[in-house]
Swiss-Prot record:
Inhibits RpoS proteolysis by regulating RssB activity, thereby increasing the stability of the sigma stress factor RpoS especially during phosphate starvation, but also in stationary phase and during nitrogen starvation. Its effect on RpoS stability is due to its interaction with RssB, which probably blocks the interaction of RssB with RpoS, and the consequent delivery of the RssB-RpoS complex to the ClpXP protein degradation pathway. Keywords: Coiled coil, Cytoplasm, Stress response. The keyword Cytoplasm applies. The keyword Lipid metabolism does not apply. Belongs to the IraP family. GO terms for cellular component: cytoplasm. This is Anti-adapter protein IraP. NCBIfam families: PRK10244.1 (NF007598). It comes from Escherichia fergusonii (strain ATCC 35469 / DSM 13698 / CCUG 18766 / IAM 14443 / JCM 21226 / LMG 7866 / NBRC 102419 / NCTC 12128 / CDC 0568-73).
Amino acid sequence: MKNLISELLIKLAQKEEESKELVAQVEALEIIVTAMLRNMGQPEQKRVIDQIEGALAGVKPDASVPDGDTEMLRAYVKKLLRHPRQ
């Protein structure tokens, strides 16, 4: 029983580490996108945003992905593009 608990704790720690890495990757990408958008002129920025939103609108979600997840992704992309972090 102790071995099982130990194994579960190790797996949990590994998952937590993977989760931290994913959060760091997302935050890094958010910083990069924000910096790139801020360094563009308004017309270029609008063009890039329109292209990204158009590409996202044209993507048909996989049936295995819950609708809530798809909407969350779309909302986050919109927030990132239209209201980048400060």
